Amino acid sequence: MGTPRAQHPPPPQLLFLILLSCPWIQGLPLKEEEILPEPGSETPTVASEALAELLHGALLRRGPEMGYLPGSDRDPTLATPPAGQTLAVPSLPRATEPGTGPLTTAVTPNGVRGAGPTAPELLTPPPGTTAPPPPSPASPGPPLGPEGGEEETTTTIITTTTVTTTVTSPVLCNNNISEGEGYVESPDLGSPVSRTLGLLDCTYSIHVYPGYGIEIQVQTLNLSQEEELLVLAGGGSPGLAPRLLANSSMLGEGQVLRSPTNRLLLHFQSPRVPRGGGFRIHYQAYLLSCGFPPRPAHGDVSVTDLHPGGTATFHCDSGYQLQGEETLICLNGTRPSWNGETPSCMASCGGTIHNATLGRIVSPEPGGAVGPNLTCRWVIEAAEGRRLHLHFERVSLDEDNDRLMVRSGGSPLSPVIYDSDMDDVPERGLISDAQSLYVELLSETPANPLLLSLRFEAFEEDRCFAPFLAHGNVTTTDPEYRPGALATFSCLPGYALEPPGPPNAIECVDPTEPHWNDTEPACKAMCGGELSEPAGVVLSPDWPQSYSPGQDCVWGVHVQEEKRILLQVEILNVREGDMLTLFDGDGPSARVLAQLRGPQPRRRLLSSGPDLTLQFQAPPGPPNPGLGQGFVLHFKEVPRNDTCPELPPPEWGWRTASHGDLIRGTVLTYQCEPGYELLGSDILTCQWDLSWSAAPPACQKIMTCADPGEIANGHRTASDAGFPVGSHVQYRCLPGYSLEGAAMLTCYSRDTGTPKWSDRVPKCALKYEPCLNPGVPENGYQTLYKHHYQAGESLRFFCYEGFELIGEVTITCVPGHPSQWTSQPPLCKVTQTTDPSRQLEGGNLALAILLPLGLVIVLGSGVYIYYTKLQGKSLFGFSGSHSYSPITVESDFSNPLYEAGDTREYEVSI
């Protein structure tokens, strides 16, 4: 081209003619045209620009399937780039190959195809982008020609440039989302972009602030069998691999899932073929929390808040010390966690307790850090002017290996006031003469478990010490326990005061040297007794300590006449050879309800009447160390009933009863709906004690497929040996065999019914060419006729009766290239010899039948002629004259249908 001339818009008449000719030029290749204006024509401003834009839109309509307007999208779901982003228009050659997105035509002035920053990128900017406004009609435009008043020539060049743009869906495929709440939708599979992309493989990564998790709810889910949607939690951090929460077979509309971390992934795959439906998922962030810290043994924990910033404070029971941090803080993070390990409560082996007021001394457990041998020394010091009272709560020492000594003072040289080798355990306890006590425990590999719990209390010298009653309660008239105060004792259920009977109260006496006028009673679990309360407890002798051998205890439990007794076995751990027998009635002569031995789990028993008898027998003999803890039985009265408790039908299932009323012996049979399996016993029986033989079962949805099995001449690889929903089984054949059928089977769930495999199990067939059917021999036939036979298959031939087979009866297809039969097909020939007994067959048999038949016909015809022609008599023997003349052969009737002498033919078959 030469020197560019000044450009003027084309005259409106020419543009209008070109616009009218668009239907004829539609589909033709675009090319540049020079349009020269008529001399003396004026330069239109706004009207010519509008017509140019109309022309531009008409040129865009290159086919009926691509009806785009300038700067618009055909599919409303394919949004334009976000605001602020620049859509580059590259310089392209005139002939461009089709791209993967919609084609947009841009008009650039001066023939510049998007090159340089001065060229506008699009004639009409897409929504959401910023572009310079069009020039106002009133504002002067830029100079169109050289300065100096030279004659200007206007040339308009329309350049059509094919621009490949990348468009995105509202929620982009492979997109990172950081908002706290929103929606994730599947891309439109019917859009032009999706049709050209082929297989869609999209990953939506949702991440929120640390300390928050992500909760999703499936609002719409309509996927085909070929489409897959995976929900994964985690990922995005080193060492934190994503964990599968669910796949498309496990998801359902309305389902809610929570990610335990601040990141969640949605992985969607879809084939190229557009399908309806898709998915729509709502997501929102929720505040994560630390797990509840475990309670330490012999201690407890109190938590202010489980969310980040909350604290957990640990404390130990009396006699135990905390090992570790007393307070833990919930720290924020991808997964909030406590800032330390959970502490433990340990009994210390010795130590000094200053300013003692109230507390305990507990022996540590042998072994571990302290070793099998113990030497523990405690010093208990009270404040000035106070003394100490030591109460023996629980003591179990090995006579040969354990020793406990208590001294009134604070040194090993203080006077001994108790020695386990010489003294019995003081039920009243010990009182120090000074403000200190020295306690020493020695244990050398004991044969029996070591148990020691001593309760100490400091009290004023002008007052009595506070009485203590293990397994009981103490009420007093003076909480300060000054002289004159009364203390009354009562035991907890299952225990009895010892010594029994009144007085059950003691008094603080002697103002000069205050002391109690009697010893404190004790609450002990007794061996036997009569119990008539509506509810109570039966304990083994000396509970919670182990019972001693040589026990024979009988308890009688009685309630109101119209009631019966429900017995709950909470703890049962008796020695081998010991037995607890329950009698359904008053006395050991009643029917035996149950006999319990050794350790037993928790269970319930029901009497038939208002009386129940319990007998515990432990033969005398040396105790078995480590066993025989005892038992704890709770009882209460319940209404009398002659039926077992009503059991509701299971969810997703039903039950049938053998009787209308749930009386003794009634059998309940449980079944589940299709797609669910029964967890528990399917048959329950109402027992004699009106309790069911087992806990009611439940119906659980089956989430596994049946084992599809192995294949001959091949092997398989399973992603999960249990075949859960979503698992895959890959089949492969041995060398020389080819797979017929689907190579991979997928277990998918169904709304009704059990999970099912996506296809049938394939087969492994030989890779050799099949043998063609050799044909059927004349006068013979084959078994299982088909056109092709695989290598190794056999074909068998048979002949019809009267023919004999010449050749091989069975031929086999031998593998090869090509495969061949082992021999030629046989022939069927007529049998040479005939059995004499069958000589009448064929023509002889026909002659034997037709010859007698012909004789019968001849004789019958002769008799007929004889009677009718020769004798002139009727064959039927009618007699008498008639009132009409016989009709002769020459009748007056002219109708041939009534002509005499008609001929009839009879066909006789035998």
From Swiss-Prot:
One of its GO terms (biological process) is synapse maturation. The chain crosses the membrane at residues 845-865. Disulfide bonds join 173-202, 290-330, 316-345, 349-376, 464-508, 491-523, 527-553, 644-686, 672-699, 705-747, 733-764, 771-813, 799-828. Residues 288-347, 462-525, 642-701, 703-766, 769-830 form the Sushi domain. Residues 65-152 are annotated as: Disordered. CDD domains: CCP (cd00033), CUB (cd00041). Residues 173-286, 349-459, 527-638 form the CUB domain. Induction: Increased expression in the majority of primary lung cancers and lung-cell lines tested. One of its GO terms (cellular component) is endoplasmic reticulum membrane. It is found in: Cell membrane; Endoplasmic reticulum membrane. Residues 866-910 are cytoplasmic. The keyword ATP-binding does not apply. Residues 123-145 have a biased composition (Pro residues). Residues 41-48 are annotated as: O-glycosylated at one site. InterPro entries: CUB_dom, SEZ6_CSMD_C4BPB_Regulators, Sperma_CUB_dom_sf, Sushi/SCR/CCP_sf, Sushi_SCR_CCP_dom. Residues 28-844 are extracellular. Residues 1-27 form the signal peptide. May serve as a prognostic marker for lung cancers. This is Seizure 6-like protein 2. It comes from Homo sapiens (Human).
